[in-house]
Amino acid sequence: MILFSPIGTADPITALGDGPMLHIVRHYRPIVVVLFLSAEIAAFENADRRYSAAITRLAPETDVRIVTYTNPSVHRFDLFVPVFRNHLVELSAEFPDRTILLNTSSGTPAMQAALVAINVFGIPRTTAVQVSTPARALSKPGDRESPDAYDLELMWDANDDNQPGAPNRCFEATSAALGALLERANLKQLIVSYDYSAAVTIAADSRLPDQVSNLIRGAMHRSRLEHLVAPKFFKDTAFTYDPANKVAEYISALALLAKREQWAEFARSATPAITIVLRAAVAKHLPEDRYLDDMGRVDRRKLEREPEIRCALKHPPKSPNAEWYLYTKDWLALLRQFAPDRVGALEVLGRFESRVRNTAAHEIVSISEDRITKDGGLLPEQLLKILARETGADLTLYDRLNDEIIRQIDMAPLG
């Protein structure tokens, strides 16, 4: 037998036992193992040979071959199909009488989806092998060692799969199950891409448990800031949803636009976020009822009794009867007057907002991350960190949510 295996963060051994690749080697004893490594994973192999050394430790006679994939787009399903197929066709020609095993439990969701698709179409003929987790339940982040401080000797000695009688967690996917596997691999790819709307459509027909489907649907509603609908999907989960803290939810959703690289929408959506943060900063030092009405507009009658505030707000509307709303420059002026120690930390927000807003509103150009950084003077990541610091927003929310959704998809029965 020949094993073709992408490598992921559960390989070669976790705190609970064999990772998928090593478990297949343990129970199938292939004569050749081809490890397909992304650039990030290859760096770990180059540093300590953790993947090849684990195979050699278990099965010294195995021929271990390494393929390094340097393209950073490790979440592009369409890129992997021809790459994998070329390697598999070569293996089939080299070993015409051997069964080629595909590890469909390791690597990125896109890698898994590509291997399942190749197996379904049968060119070349392969056998898809799935491996359940050692706990046969949802894995947890703490189950995996940090890849940056990995001790193979320690993990080997603590590996319960080395014990006599340890169960075989491998199973070969049947033709009926392969369609479901491919569908779920595609679903995971949509989740990784933060395309929750498309994921909801696929999940509706994928025979997943309601718990998983509801979490995907909740992610969709939450990312849309649908505060009346979303909270019910996160009841009794680790992903606390407080509808009262709409500002933090907005910042988390803004971070999602950056992850999706929707830079034009990010530029437009940054303005309200910055305004909210500056207004909240002012409110900590200057009660709003001293100068604003219930609608958040400047109350001119109140302002007559507030010379300090009136002095700071130097740009009233030209018409004395016009509604008076405050903008970024006004909130910064109030900060200078009433909280000068806070201006230095927040003034960058004003510069970013005014410059990027002008680009988004007045120029017919493609807005890129580089353009936002050049015009705004801040990387989007830097802007988000400032906004999160001021609001308590969780910038990792949707990544953590994705991890949980994918874990539940992986553990859901195929029938």
Curated annotation (Swiss-Prot):
Which EC number(s) does the record attach to this protein? 3.1.-.-
**Cross-referenced Pfam families, in alphabetical order?**
Cas_Csm6_6H, Cas_Csm6_CARF, Cas_Csm6_HEPN
Q: What segment(s) does the record annotate as region HEPN domain?
A: 149-415
InterPro entries according to UniProt = CRISPR-assoc_prot_Csm6, Csm6_CARF, Csm6_HEPN
Q: Where is this region: CARF domain?
A: 1-148
Matching entries from CDD domains are given as: Csm6_III-A
Enumerate the UniProt keywords alphabetically. Answer: Antiviral defense, Endonuclease, Hydrolase, Nuclease
Q: Which domain of life is it from?
A: Bacteria
Phenotype upon loss of function: Deletion of the entire CRISPR-Cas locus (cas6 to cas2, Rv2824c to Rv2816c) decreases resistance to plasmids encoding spacer elements about 6-fold.
Q: How is its activity regulated?
A: Non-specific ssRNase activity is allosterically activated by cyclic oligoadenylates (cOA), a second messenger produced by Cas10 of the ternary Csm effector complex in the presence of a cognate target RNA.
Q: Molecular function terms in GO for this entry?
A: endonuclease activity
Instruction: Tell me one GO biological process term.
Output: defense response to virus
- Annotated signal sequence is none
Instruction: Give yes or no: UniProt keyword Iron.
Output: no
Binding partners and assembly: Homodimer; the composite ssRNase active site is formed at the dimer interface.
Describe the family membership recorded for this protein in Swiss-Prot or TrEMBL: Belongs to the CRISPR-associated Csm6 family.
Write out the domain note: The N-terminal CRISPR-associated Rossman fold (CARF) probably binds the cOA effector. ssRNase activity resides in the C-terminal HEPN domain.
Q: What does this protein do?
A: CRISPR (clustered regularly interspaced short palindromic repeat) is an adaptive immune system that provides protection against mobile genetic elements (viruses, transposable elements and conjugative plasmids). CRISPR clusters contain spacers, sequences complementary to antecedent mobile elements, and target invading nucleic acids. CRISPR clusters are transcribed and processed into CRISPR RNA (crRNA).
What remark does the entry add?
A: Encoded in a type III-A CRISPR locus.
Q: What is this protein called?
A: CRISPR system endoribonuclease Csm6
Organism of origin is Mycobacterium tuberculosis (strain ATCC 25618 / H37Rv)
This chain is encoded by the gene named csm6
